[in-house]
Amino acid sequence: MFQDPAERPYKLHDLCNEVEESIHEICLNCVYCKQELQRSEVYDFACYDLCIVYREGQPYGVCMKCLKFYSKISEYRWYRYSVYGETLEKQCNKQLCHLLIRCITCQKPLCPVEKQRHLEEKKRFHNIGGRWTGRCMSCWKPTRRETEV
């Protein structure tokens, strides 16, 4: 389909334009398990601003099950260190709102509210293979409370 790497669209919106299909019609397979992405996964792929990858000229996305699985594998393999938000701002010489920080679990880019939550709750951001991660609202796990009797 796209043999020349220079002509390959790497964002889903651009791929849709190139093949003249809407996001509601386009079919993508998962690069890992090779299963066809469900429509909700195609929408998530676009919303999470993930990149299309190519194998033998064919475009692939990633299903949510594989995305979460390989995100965990990356965390185990490539974890470097964790820092608080204020330290990260000083280290990068940028405000958090200007940094791309993805969710460590689902890879969704964190919005300003999610980044602020890390500051308010004194949670760290993690450097995984040179990329910064935290937790989005959907993947945030509340701390376990003791049961009152």
Swiss-Prot record:
Keywords: Activator, DNA-binding, Early protein, Host cytoplasm, Host nucleus, Host-virus interaction, Inhibition of host innate immune response by virus, Inhibition of host IRF3 by virus, Inhibition of host RLR pathway by virus, Metal-binding, Modulation of host cell apoptosis by virus, Oncogene, Transcription, Transcription regulation, Viral immunoevasion, Zinc, Zinc-finger. Forms homodimers. Interacts with ubiquitin-protein ligase UBE3A/E6-AP and thus forms a complex with human TP53. Interacts with human NFX1 and MAGI3. Interacts with human IRF3; this interaction inhibits the establishment of antiviral state. Interacts with human TYK2; this interaction inhibits JAK-STAT activation by interferon alpha. Interacts with host DLG1; this interaction leads to the proteasomal degradation of DLG1. A zinc finger (unnamed) spans 30-66, 103-139. Belongs to the high risk human alphapapillomavirus family. The cancer-causing human papillomavirus E6 protein has a unique carboxy terminal PDZ domain containing substrate. Its main location: host cell. Pfam families: E6. GO terms for cellular component: host cell cytoplasm; host cell nucleus. Belongs to the papillomaviridae E6 protein family. This protein may be involved in the oncogenic potential of this virus (associated with cancer of the uterine cervix). Plays a major role in the induction and maintenance of cellular transformation. Acts mainly as an oncoprotein by stimulating the destruction of many host cell key regulatory proteins. E6 associates with host UBE3A/E6-AP ubiquitin-protein ligase, and inactivates tumor suppressors TP53 and TP73 by targeting them to the 26S proteasome for degradation. In turn, DNA damage and chromosomal instabilities increase and lead to cell proliferation and cancer development. The gene is E6. GO terms for molecular function: DNA binding; PDZ domain binding; zinc ion binding. It is found in: Host cytoplasm; Host nucleus. Disulfide bonds: none annotated. InterPro entries: E6, E6_sf. The keyword Iron-sulfur does not apply. It comes from Human papillomavirus 35. A motif (PDZ-binding domain) lies at residues 147-149. GO terms for biological process: DNA-templated transcription; regulation of DNA-templated transcription; symbiont-mediated perturbation of host apoptosis; symbiont-mediated perturbation of host ubiquitin-like protein modification; symbiont-mediated suppression of host cytoplasmic pattern recognition receptor signaling pathway via inhibition of IRF3 activity; symbiont-mediated suppression of host type I interferon-mediated signaling pathway. This is Protein E6.
